[in-house]
């Protein structure tokens, strides 16, 4: 401490000796250091504005001020006014006029906070006019302009008490510039910007002639308490008004937005919902474990009671009771439907060619509607509901403010470039990333200039289209040149000029001389982007060549805090005007973007060794979606081909090599596929007639889906026909009819359930999904109808061909000498009968299976609670898309989120004082105004998702009107008398301000408001008036023809939004904020009750659906269960137990699917919702056939009926449902589109696997325990039919093979179970007929 004090004394002595021999020998109260003006500073030239005159050296007593001089002093420097008789000053009238003029520039920025503005003025008033000037001012350098004249002061020292300086700085440190959404001190602190600014640096910048505004150099010394100065000098310690205090009765304190001390106590938003725990276990997990345990226990109890009940029944069974009325009712629907379809099938099989012709005519008639098809490719039209709130908001925004401009953006990182250190003269040692290398910047500048000068020929316009024809030009929208185009990049700090980029200069600072170059200028501009002239020896501007600042978060990315030199990526953004779809300029914009993409692809290839580049144009997303759709068409075609091949091969019943050509079902398989495709085309044509738009996704996916569903019915029908023996004397047509009567109710059950599920899925508001659901539902109905007609006719013709031993495909030839087919059951049926079913339904296996599936259900219930909701837009792209890298870079490097506009509708009066105060955020405004509420929200970005407070045209309009600035003036004479005079006009014709000076905040009258607002909106901002509204607010206020405001907007920024969950939550939070603002503004007198404030972000239309997709999904899926249960209940013969077990299996499939979606990275959204609706429909295929087979079986026990259903219908379901789905689904894994891979390949694979497991493993076990009792009505009918058949049995012997003894023509009796003694089939005792075909 002693050493420090000795050092201070030594410094004071040296300073005192230096002062003694310089220009201010007298330091005492009442003495000046300089007085009067001595012209311009000869050492300076090229200031940003006309620099003020410098003062004359004059160490003389202060002058007594009177008259006009006193009045001027009182107006300019009110704190130096001591009354009419006791006011002294060290400045002349000329000096006061110059001081007032020079302060007007800064006051334009600070006037919104009166305390700050007055404190700032007070500092410079004391320096220039204080009567005690010599106490704290010491001149250090003068120049002699002319002999005989007083020397002119070009440099001096000012000594302040540190507390005085820091209080003054503190009062200004939070004052904002609304248009730039930044702090005013950021442009008043030089290279340090707002982040590194403090009182010393703030004052140093004001005294630095290098800033282009200061007329002389001032060195500020801030002294701690107790530090003394020699020769009677005393540091200035004047009055400072805190920002939260007013200047007087008519003045207002600074607002919360400009002064932290003025802020009311804002309770922090509620913390993120804490996790729910029960003890140390997550609450949901604990609840699900309890639920699963109860479910398992209940199942065990039910099984036990059921087994015990069966044992009691077996002990008391003595006679066969007649079917009671409920059982007859249960049997009635089965009988009615069976007889109807049997009759129908017989008639169709009897007239196959007629039915085929009629079916073909109907399909063609409906397909003609495809000529009217409208394919939707616009992502907005595909993925957002036309009547959704977001679409309405978008329509309002586009109508009143124009569409959000089209963004063409480039991210660039350096390959194999390590970071390096740079010792900056201004900021000391700084780390620079590899991308910030001069040679790379030069190459990127060449790229940027090539893109800026890019031209492309338009055949429609018959001329070249260039960037200036379509670009967004905020400062010159009507007569745009190339340099007016908004291009944001780091290179704009050098005005896109190679020469300026290479510029170097020697600079001395604090006694150290060093070379400064582009790196110093970059550091300066990144910290102070509003700078018109940096403080380096380069003296370069930071303003882009189109006239606006480039903020660092839009030019560089991948940095921490404010370490911009460590940025890993450079960002180049071309902003292009957006136009309506029918505007010719939209085609021009897309044409230029196409050329932009080609240039970028070429540059990416040629510089792959230097740069890693990601880029995007506005048209890119739509282009890539369309590209992948076309690319994946062959994948879908192969999928259809494989399913067709499988059907063709699997439908055949092969017994001998010599009969392969005859027993093949290629034609029948092709016909089945044609039936499916015909149903799809007919459905699409039908909706085209109605004007319902379609999409490429429908063309891809719906045929595949309907083929998978339709192939199931084809298999079940054909296999049943092959297995069902022909009755004695039964014609082929009757045989087909009887087969159809047996399986058609089951086909109807599945098709109807699936179609209803799809139609319910159309309740979603997403257009693409809605159209997909409608088309799929109708296609399934048409598919069922065509299967009941065209396919039955095809089977009739194919059976006739096979029975005539004609080869498939080339049926014109006949093979008469072929041996008859062998009677055998087939490998699949054999496997199910001998191996699978006995193992599955073993007494020890069944409880294990039941327990495992219940545990799996419980586990997936928990996983279901953790599924992510949303759809990231990159999933709509192919895996090889260049946009994948773009979205990756966007999320990794962009340090700010998208802009969010708070739009106001008509019905609010902005022109009243109350109306303005409820909107603005400067002095005199309400504490909970619109902009203040957004400011409060921005202080909690993790909850509000707002990171940067809103710009406000109301605030800047008020500041623009302030008389102390040079912004709003009126011509007092000349040809433009009484018209607006721009701040660039310095003539004496513009001496009248728009508003008179007031003691309180400036507020225009209603008449003044409507008169001056258009002037403000068309005023170009410049150094003399930075508040001009042309650049920032030209499109922010929509005026009617009579000047009334019908819409306005206030722009803020979200925090970085990385995924769809962030976008969804940001939309939710901004709507809550807007609703709160709306409720507050409706309290302002004169406000329309329908007035509204709403948030608009360009992405809202895509993420609106995710606000409600969860409850909508639960409702839709729950709704799907109702018709599924009802249809099953009705078509299974009013069997409620079968319906419940059927529904239970479907619910378990659905829950397991959703749970495993979370494991496999499949998010929940509208696309997955429609697939889950499909899952309900497809689950019906897996379980309903087996449930119905169990219900109509006449075996005496549940276990035997379960075995019977598993062997016969289970094998058919495996061959017809699972095996027709698997090949097509697996092929989808090769699709390029991630949307197809994730939401159709993965999800449908899960659905098929889980459906297969539940249908062929879980359901038979459950039915063996809890299935319904045997239907005695069916038992009775079977008994009567058997007795009738035995009575009519012919006496002629049977042939050992189903062939005519003389001609050997094949007779299709189907598969005869009498050759398999192990199966006690009801039909095994039926006699055979020698009917030949």
From Swiss-Prot:
Query: Deletion: any effect?
Result: Mice have multiple lipid transport defects and have a protective effect against diet-induced hyperlipidemia. They have also a deregulation of CAV1 transport and localization, suggesting that the observed lipid transport defect may be the indirect result of an inability of cells to properly target and/or regulate CAV1 expression.
Coiled-coil stretches noted in the UniProt entry, renumbered to this chain? none
- One of the record's GO cellular component terms: apical plasma membrane
The yes or no answer to whether the keyword Iron-sulfur is present is no
Q: In which tissues is it expressed?
A: Expressed in small intestine, stomach and muscle, along with detectable expression in lung, heart, gall bladder, brain, testis, skin and liver. Expression in liver is extremely low.
Q: Which InterPro entries match?
A: HMGCR/SNAP/NPC1-like_SSD (IPR053958), NPC1-like (IPR004765), NPC1_MLD (IPR053956), NPC1_N (IPR032190), SSD (IPR000731)
Induction text? Cholesterol/cholate feeding resulted in down-regulation of intestinal expression. Expression is decreased by 35% in the jejunum upon PPARD activation.
List residues of the SSD domain: 632-797
The protein's PTM annotation reads: Highly glycosylated.
Pull the Cytoplasmic topological domain ranges from the record: 306-352, 654-665, 718-742, 798-846, 1135-1142, 1187-1206, 1264-1333
Give the Pfam families listed for this entry: NPC1_MLD (PF22314), NPC1_N (PF16414), Sterol-sensing (PF12349)
User: GO MF terms on file?
Assistant: lipid transporter activity; protein homodimerization activity
Q: Give the Extracellular compartment stretches of this protein.
A: 21-284, 374-632, 687-696, 764-776, 868-1113, 1164-1165, 1228-1242
Q: Which UniProt keywords apply?
A: Cell membrane, Cholesterol metabolism, Disulfide bond, Glycoprotein, Lipid metabolism, Membrane, Signal, Steroid metabolism, Sterol metabolism, Transmembrane, Transmembrane helix, Transport
Question: What biological process terms from GO does the record include?
Answer: cholesterol homeostasis; cholesterol metabolic process; cholesterol transport; intestinal cholesterol absorption
- Mind telling me which PANTHER family this protein's record contains? NPC INTRACELLULAR CHOLESTEROL TRANSPORTER 1, NPC1-LIKE INTRACELLULAR CHOLESTEROL TRANSPORTER 1
Protein family (similarity comment): Belongs to the patched family.
What the protein does comes down to: Plays a major role in cholesterol homeostasis. Critical for the uptake of cholesterol across the plasma membrane of the intestinal enterocyte. Involved in plant sterol absorption, it transports sitosterol, although at lower rates than cholesterol. May have a function in the transport of multiple lipids and their homeostasis, thereby influencing lipid metabolism regulation. May be involved in caveolin trafficking from the plasma membrane. Acts as a negative regulator of NPC2 and down-regulates its expression and secretion by inhibiting its maturation and accelerating its degradation.
Which NCBIfam families does the UniProt record give? 2A060601 (TIGR00917)
Name of the protein described by the UniProt record:
NPC1-like intracellular cholesterol transporter 1
Give the originating organism.
Mus musculus (Mouse)
């Amino acid at each position: 401490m002693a050493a420090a004090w000795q050092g201070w004394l030594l410094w004071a002595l040296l300073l005192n000796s230096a002062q003694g021999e310089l220009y201010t020998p007298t330091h005492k109260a009442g003495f000046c250091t300089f007085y009067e003006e001595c012209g311009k500073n000869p050492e300076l030239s090229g200031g940003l504005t006309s620099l003020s005159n410098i003062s004359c050296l004059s160490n003389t007593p202060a002058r007594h001020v009177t008259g006009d001089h006193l009045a001027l002093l009182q107006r300019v420097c009110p704190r130096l006014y001591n009354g009419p008789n006791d006011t002294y000053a060290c400045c002349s009238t000329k000096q006061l006029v110059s001081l007032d003029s020079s302060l007007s520039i800064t006051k334009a920025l600070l006037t919104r906070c009166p305390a700050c503005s007055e404190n700032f003025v007070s500092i410079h008033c004391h320096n220039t006019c204080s009567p005690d000037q010599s106490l704290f001012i010491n001149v250090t350098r003068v120049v002699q302009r002319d002999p005989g004249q007083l020397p002119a002061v070009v440099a001096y020292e000012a000594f302040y008490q540190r507390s005085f300086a820091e209080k003054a700085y503190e009062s200004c440190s939070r004052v904002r510039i609304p248009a730039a959404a930044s702090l005013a001190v950021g442009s008043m602190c030089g290279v340090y910007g707002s982040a590194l600014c403090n009182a010393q640096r703030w004052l140093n910048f004001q005294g630095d002639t290098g800033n282009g505004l200061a007329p002389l150099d001032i060195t500020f010394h801030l002294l701690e308490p107790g530090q003394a100065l020699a020769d009677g000098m005393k540091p200035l310690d004047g009055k400072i008004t805190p920002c939260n205090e007013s200047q007087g009765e008519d003045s207002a304190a600074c607002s919360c937005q400009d002064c932290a001390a003025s802020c009311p106590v804002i309770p922090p938003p509620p913390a993120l919902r804490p996790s729910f725990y029960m003890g140390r276990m997550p609450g949901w997990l604990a609840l699900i474990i309890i639920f699963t345990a109860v479910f398992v226990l209940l199942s065990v109890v039910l099984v036990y009671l059921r087994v015990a009940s069966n044992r009691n029944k077996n002990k008391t069974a003595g006679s066969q009771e007649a079917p009671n009325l409920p059982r007859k009712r249960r049997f009635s629907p089965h009988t009615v439907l069976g007889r109807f379809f049997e009759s129908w099938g017989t008639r169709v099989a009897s007239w196959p060619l007629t039915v085929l012709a009629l079916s073909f005519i109907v399909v063609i008639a409906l397909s003609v509607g495809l000529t009217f098809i409208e394919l939707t490719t616009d992502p907005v039209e595909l993925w957002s509901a036309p009547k959704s709130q977001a679409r309405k908001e978008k329509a309002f925004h586009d109508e009143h403010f124009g569409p959000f401009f089209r963004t063409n953006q480039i991210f660039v990182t350096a390959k194999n470039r390590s970071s390096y250190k740079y010792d900056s003269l201004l900021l000391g040692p700084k780390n620079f990333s590899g991308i910030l290398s001069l040679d790379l910047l030069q190459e990127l500048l060449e790229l940027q200039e090539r893109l800026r000068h890019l031209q492309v020929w338009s055949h429609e316009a018959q001329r070249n289209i260039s960037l200036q024809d379509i670009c967004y030009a905020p400062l010159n929208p009507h007569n745009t040149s190339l340099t007016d185009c908004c291009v944001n990049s780091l290179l704009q700090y050098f005005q896109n000029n190679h020469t300026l980029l290479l510029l170097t200069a020697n600079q001395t600072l604090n006694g150290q001389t060093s070379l400064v170059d582009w790196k110093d200028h970059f550091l300066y501009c990144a910290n102070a982007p509003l700078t018109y002239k940096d403080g380096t020896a380069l003296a370069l501007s930071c303003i882009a060549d189109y006239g606006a600042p480039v903020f660092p978060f839009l030019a560089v990315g991948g940095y921490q805090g404010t370490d911009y030199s460590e940025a890993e990526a450079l960002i180049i953004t071309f902003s292009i005007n957006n136009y309506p779809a029918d505007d010719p300029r939209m085609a021009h914009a897309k044409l230029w973007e196409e050329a932009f993409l080609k240039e970028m692809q070429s540059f990416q290839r040629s510089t792959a060794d230097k740069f890693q580049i990601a880029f995007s144009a506005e048209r890119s997303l739509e282009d890539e979606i369309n590209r992948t759709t076309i690319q994946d068409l062959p994948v879908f075609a192969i999928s259809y081909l494989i399913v067709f091949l499988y059907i063709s091969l699997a439908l055949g019943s092969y017994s001998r090599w010599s009969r392969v050509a005859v027993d093949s079902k290629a034609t029948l398989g092709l016909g089945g596929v044609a039936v499916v495709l015909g149903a799809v085309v007919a459905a699409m044509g039908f909706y085209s007639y109605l004007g319902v738009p379609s999409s490429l996704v429908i063309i891809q996916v719906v045929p595949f889906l309907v083929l998978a569903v339709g192939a199931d019915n084809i298999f079940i029908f054909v296999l049943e026909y092959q297995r069902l023996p022909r009755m004695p004397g039964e014609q082929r047509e009757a045989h087909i009819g009887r087969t159809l009567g047996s399986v058609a109710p089951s086909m109807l059950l599945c098709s109807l359930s699936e179609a209803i599920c799809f139609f319910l899925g159309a309740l979603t508001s997403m257009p693409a999904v809605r159209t997909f659901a409608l088309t799929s539902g109708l296609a399934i109905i048409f598919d069922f109808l065509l299967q009941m007609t065209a396919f039955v006719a095809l089977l009739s013709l194919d059976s006739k061909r096979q029975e005539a031993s004609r080869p498939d495909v080339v049926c014109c030839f006949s093979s008469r000498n072929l041996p008859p087919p062998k009677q055998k059951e087939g490998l699949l049926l054999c496997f199910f009968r001998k191996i699978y079913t006995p193992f599955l339904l073993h007494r020890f296996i069944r409880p294990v299976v039941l327990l495992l599936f219940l545990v799996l259900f419980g586990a997936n219930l928990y996983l279901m609670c953790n599924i992510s909701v949303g759809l990231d837009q990159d999933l709509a792209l192919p895996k090889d898309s260049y946009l994948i890298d773009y979205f990756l870079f966007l999320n990794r490097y962009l340090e700010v989120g998208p802009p969010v506009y708070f739009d106001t509708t008509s019905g609010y009066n902005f022109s009243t004082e109350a109306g303005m105060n409820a909107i603005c955020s400067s002095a005199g405004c309400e504490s909970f105004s619109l902009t203040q509420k957004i400011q409060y929200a921005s202080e909690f970005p993790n909850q509000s998702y707002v990171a940067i407070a809103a710009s406000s045209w109301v605030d800047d309009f008020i500041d623009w009107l302030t008389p102390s600035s040079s912004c709003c003036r009126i011509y007092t004479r000349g040809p433009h008398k009484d018209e607006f005079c721009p701040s660039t006009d310095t003539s004496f014709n513009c001496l009248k301000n728009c508003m008179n000076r007031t003691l309180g905040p400036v507020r225009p009258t209603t008449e003044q408001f409507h008169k001056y607002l258009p002037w403000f909106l068309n005023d170009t901002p410049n150094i003399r008036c930075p508040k001009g509204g042309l650049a920032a607010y030209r499109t922010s206020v929509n005026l009617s023809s009579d000047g009334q405001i019908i819409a306005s907007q206030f722009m803020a920024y979200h925090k970085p939004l990385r995924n769809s969950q962030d976008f969804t939550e940001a939309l939710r939070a901004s709507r809550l904020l807007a609703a709160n603002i709306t409720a507050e503004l409706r309290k302002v007198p004169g406000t329309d009750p329908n007035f509204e404030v709403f948030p608009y972000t360009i992405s809202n239309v895509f993420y609106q659906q995710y606000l409600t997709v969860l409850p909508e999904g639960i409702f839709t899926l729950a709704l799907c269960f109702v018709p599924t249960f009802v249809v099953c209940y009705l078509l299974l013969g009013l069997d409620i137990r079968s319906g419940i077990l059927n529904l239970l299996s479907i619910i378990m499939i659905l829950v397991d699917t959703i749970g495993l979606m979370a494991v496999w990275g499949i998010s929940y959204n509208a696309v997955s919702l429609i697939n889950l609706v499909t899952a309900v429909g497809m689950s019906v295929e897996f379980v309903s056939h087996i449930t119905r087979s169990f219900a109509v079986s006449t075996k005496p026990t549940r276990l035997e009926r379960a075995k019977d259903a598993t062997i016969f219908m289970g094998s058919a379901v495996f061959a017809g449902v699972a095996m027709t789905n698997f090949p097509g689904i697996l092929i989808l894994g090769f699709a390029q589109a991630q949307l197809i891979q994730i939401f159709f390949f993965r999800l449908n694979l899960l659905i098929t696997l889980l459906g297969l497991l539940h249908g062929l493993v879980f359901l038979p076990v459950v039915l063996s325990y809890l299935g319904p009792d045997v239907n005695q009505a069916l038992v009775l009918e079977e008994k009567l039919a058997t007795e009738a058949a035995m009575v009519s049995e012919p006496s002629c012997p049977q042939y050992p093979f189903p062939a005519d003894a003389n001609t050997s023509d094949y007779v299709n009796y189907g598969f005869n179970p009498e050759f398999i003694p192990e199966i006690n089939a009801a039909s095994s005792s039926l006699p055979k007929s020698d009917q030949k075909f």
